[in-house]
Structures are given as C-alpha cells and as structure tokens.
Amino acid sequence: MKAFISPTHDVPWPGNAMIRGLLKQHHDRAERSIEILAALKDDLRLDCQFVQRAAERPIELFEVHAPDYLHYLETAWDEWSKAPDASFEVRPYITTNRYFPTLRTQIPVTLAGRYLGDGGSPLVQDAWVNMNGSVDAAVAAADAIIAGERSAYALLRPAGHHAMRDLAMGGCHIANTAIAAQRLAKRFGRVAVLDIDVHHGNGTQQIFYDRDDVLTVSLHGKPETLFPFICGYADEIGSGAGEGYNCNLPMEGGTAISGYLGHFDRALERIKDFAPGVLVVAAGFDTFRHDPFGNLDIDTADYAVLGLSLIHISEPTRQEAIS
C-alpha cells in the first residue's frame, strides 16, 4: 500500500483550543503525526511518499466549500494581524446568531464569528498553506485509487471531518475526506464514506446530506456526551435525494469492542447494500480507551480486528483510508 504524506503534517499548528470552557493545548499536535509516520515506515513498511504542493488548487476544493469561506481562510490571518493588539491566533469571541444572522460589518472580528464555529478551531499564520497540504495528500491518495491502486493511505494534518461547507469546527477547516470522496465520485459513481472517529463527522454529513451518490456512515460516541454535541443522532438520515444515505450509529460511553462490533457490522452491512465503487475511511483513533477527549473503550489490539473487516468488505470495491 502507498501512503501519501502531507507536506505540512509535522508543522507546530494549531496552538490552543477552548475545550469545555478551558484553554488547553490542542490535541492535534505535530508529535502525534510524526509517530504515525514512523509506524507507517518502520512497522508497516508502507511505501511512504511525501506529496508536493500542487501548483493549482483542485476543483473539488471549490465544489465542496463555499467561495466566500475559502477566501476568508486564505486572508483571515493577514487581516486579523493588522490590528496593533491582535492575538497570535484568530479566534471568535462574537458570533452570528438568530438575532444577527447577517454581517453588516465585514471586519476581522465579525468574520471570525461567522466562519469559525467554536473555540477549538483557531487560525494562525500560514494556516492556509498548512490546510492545503492536507488537501494535496488527500487528492494524491484519491488519484492513486483512480489510477488503479487497490488501496491508499493519506496522513493528513490538520484533520477535516468536522469542517462544513462554510464553517470551521472541531479544529477542522477544510473537509479533506469530502474532497477525496468528491473526486472519487466522478470516477466511480457511488462512494461510501465510513467515519470511525469517536466524534461525529458532522462536516462530511452536511456536505453530502442531500446526495444519493455518496453514502456517509459515522460510528461515534453519543452526541449528548461528545463534540459536536448538536448533531450525530440516529434520526439524521439525509434529506431530499439524499434521504436514507446518511447513517449515524452513536454509542454509549464506555462501549468496548464487543459492543462496538455490533454497530460496526451494521455499518458494513449498510455499505454492502449501497454497493459503492470505492470506500473512503476517515480513520480517527480517538476511540482508544485512554484518549483524553473520547469516552469509548477500544484497545490497541481491537483495531486489527476492525482493519481486517475493512479489508474483507473492500474486496468488491477499492479502499482508501483518510487519517
């Protein structure tokens, strides 16, 4: 298997995140990505390829995200930093809401409240470059599948499954998984996205919610107890043409592998019924029992069991894992 490594996977970004009212060091640290890369090369002996920054942005970036949102991400730091008392992180402290749904004043403070959906998604200098490094790796992995590879892995940082069409959330600004799925759909027609992160993949869900060519399946802890809190419920099944093509499988806190496998098997059966041409896996591992931001009870050895199941289901299709 080829592994495509984002050129920005080890940059020291982001800094801090507001989590349950406390400012903490962001969990998506460079050290984590460096350790994953070492395991890919030394333990799994994958063919690791560092992706070079593409000369042009892929068209799927603009198909998945709103133009005004992308413009904001590209220019936010420069505009924010012009203020003499600007912080080193762009962070919202006033937001649009039901009383003020539109922005009459287009200034850095109000724009941050419009496009950054929580306190855990700050922007820093070079953020735009870093995000696009992840996009390039996701697209490279998708292109490898299109070229005939049976499977491919993309090591991405920053992550993307919380990023919505025009809103950053959960430390995610650009929806890497959705961009890969969008690119693959043009070649294979039907794409399934399986998200195994402990947190609901709200961004991927929102982007494909009204489509029937992309099935989105998310296994996660109950939204009453875990981010993003406001979505990820089982009755969110899609709308319009996409009704029935979104599947959420929330689990109680403390769920161990025995209980997890029941939900996992349901997810695989739904994917089999959909009969996709390609499977994209958003592979978060914060279901691990000692993860400080999760609440499930999955152990290290359990991931091998899940991986083997994914290999078996991907036999009639192709498989791409997005981490």
Residue ranges and their predicted role:
Residues 1-194, 199-314, 318, 323:
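HDAC/HDAC-like amidohydrolase catalytic core signature
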